[in-house]
């Protein structure tokens, strides 16, 4: 992106998989005080997330000099935060939201971003909704399994709408299972018994809730956690959530007796029992339990792919697809086998690799 004077057009090149490049011209004007104003038609701009990513990934080598670099960063930041249409409080919330999502484990980052929260409160509500669906030690095992199945169905239906191959769907399913268990484990650290070396021993039901393979090995997600064949290890209490003791859970599920502090959380929870899917697609009739999932599904019909790779321009309908794709460029392989140390960029490949270890173990047992 080249630097332009205030009187000239500022050209932002947005990669597009269907074209070599799509040029968005933003006419900048000069106000009476000599500062930069704008006659931008905000409705025709790409999603602010595109400009946020460009702002964060901008490099000094992308500009001819320091003055041009500052100018381009200022423009990208303006197109992200949009001070012409947002209040100071809204801009503050956008910055807080970005940092909050950034400190979450990667799987939870994907889950939150798929729901497109516009501020910190909406992001918290997304996590609280997920939290309300997770295991409750006082509930029957069958109900806990049913909850997990509902969550897995939601995320896999999102990726199925994108037309991913079965191997990628397996990866998404397992990512949600382990991210859900992670959030539950972090919340209930004090309720779990510790092993001799300080690792937390999870509930036995979690092992039976997954597929026939063993745990996903070491998952390097930037937080001190270790997923190793059914054992979870991380500093006790570090991520414990502090609740407001004055906040009472006044909403009770008539089916299972679980309490909720918000009526909206109870409504979502009750769909586990009723199987209700009130959000239907007018194009194909497929129904979903949440409106956010319907929005994701509708991209099958519209062809919308708002998540673009800044490296090659390839576009995706889901943010999780973009995250997986970017590992091709970065070479990141966060999924490591604890038995041999081999790493993979996709969790599905790790699971497939671990099945070979399991088969070898079985053969050794048979030989003995």
UniProtKB/Swiss-Prot annotation:
A zinc finger (C2H2-type) spans 251-273, 279-301, 307-329, 335-357. One of its GO terms (biological process) is myelination. The modification Phosphoserine is found at residues 132, 142, 274, 292. InterPro entries: SCAN_dom, SCAN_sf, Znf_C2H2_sf, Znf_C2H2_type. SMART domains: SCAN (SM00431), ZnF_C2H2 (SM00355). Disruption phenotype: According to PubMed:20080941, most mice die by postnatal day 25 (P25) due to myelination defects. Brains and spinal cords isolated from P14 mice appear to be smaller than those from wild-type mice and to lack white matter. Mutant oligodendrocytes arrest at a late stage of differentiation. Expression of genes expressed specifically in mature myelinating oligodendrocytes is down-regulated. According to PubMed:17064688, embryos are severely retarded in development and die at approximately 7.5 dpc. Residues 251-301 are annotated as: Necessary and sufficient for nuclear localization. This is Zinc finger protein 24. It comes from Mus musculus.
């Amino acid at each position: 992106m080249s630097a332009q004077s205030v009187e000239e057009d500022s050209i932002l090149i947005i990669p597009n998989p269907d074209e070599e490049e799509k040029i968005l011209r933003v006419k900048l004007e000069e106000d009476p005080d000599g500062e930069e104003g704008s006659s931008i038609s905000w409705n025709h701009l790409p999603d602010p997330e595109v400009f946020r990513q460009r702002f964060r990934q901008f490099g000094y080598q992308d500009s001819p000099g320091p003055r041009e670099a500052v100018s381009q960063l200022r423009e990208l930041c303006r197109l992200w935060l949009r001070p012409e249409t947002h209040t100071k409080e809204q801009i503050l919330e956008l910055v807080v939201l970005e940092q909050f999502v950034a400190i979450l484990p990667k799987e939870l980052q994907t889950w939150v971003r798929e729901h497109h929260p516009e501020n910190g409160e909406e992001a918290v509500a997304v996590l609280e909704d997920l939290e309300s669906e997770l295991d409750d030690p006082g509930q029957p095992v069958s109900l806990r399994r049913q909850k997990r199945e509902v969550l897995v169905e939601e995320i896999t239906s999102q990726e199925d709408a994108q037309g991913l191959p079965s191997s990628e769907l397996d990866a998404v399913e397992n990512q949600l299972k382990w991210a859900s268990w992670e959030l539950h484990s972090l919340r209930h650290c004090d309720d779990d018994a510790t092993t001799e070396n300080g690792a937390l021993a999870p509930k036995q039901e979690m092992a039976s809730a997954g597929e026939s393979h063993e745990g996903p090995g070491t998952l390097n997600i930037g937080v001190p956690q270790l997923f190793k064949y059914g054992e979870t290890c991380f500093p006790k209490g570090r991520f414990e959530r502090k609740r407001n003791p004055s906040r009472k859970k006044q909403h009770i599920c008539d089916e299972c007796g679980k309490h909720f502090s918000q009526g909206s959380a109870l409504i979502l929870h009750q769909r586990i029992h009723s199987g209700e899917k009130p959000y239907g697609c007018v194009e194909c009739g497929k129904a979903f339990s949440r409106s956010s999932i319907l929005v994701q599904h509708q991209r099958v019909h519209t062809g919308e792919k708002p998540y673009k790779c800044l490296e090659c321009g390839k576009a995706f309908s889901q943010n999780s697809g973009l995250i997986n794709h970017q590992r091709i460029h970065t070479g990141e392989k966060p999924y490591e086998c604890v038995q041999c140390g081999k790493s993979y960029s996709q969790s599905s490949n790790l699971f497939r690799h671990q099945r070979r270890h399991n088969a070898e173990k079985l053969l050794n047992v048979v030989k003995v």
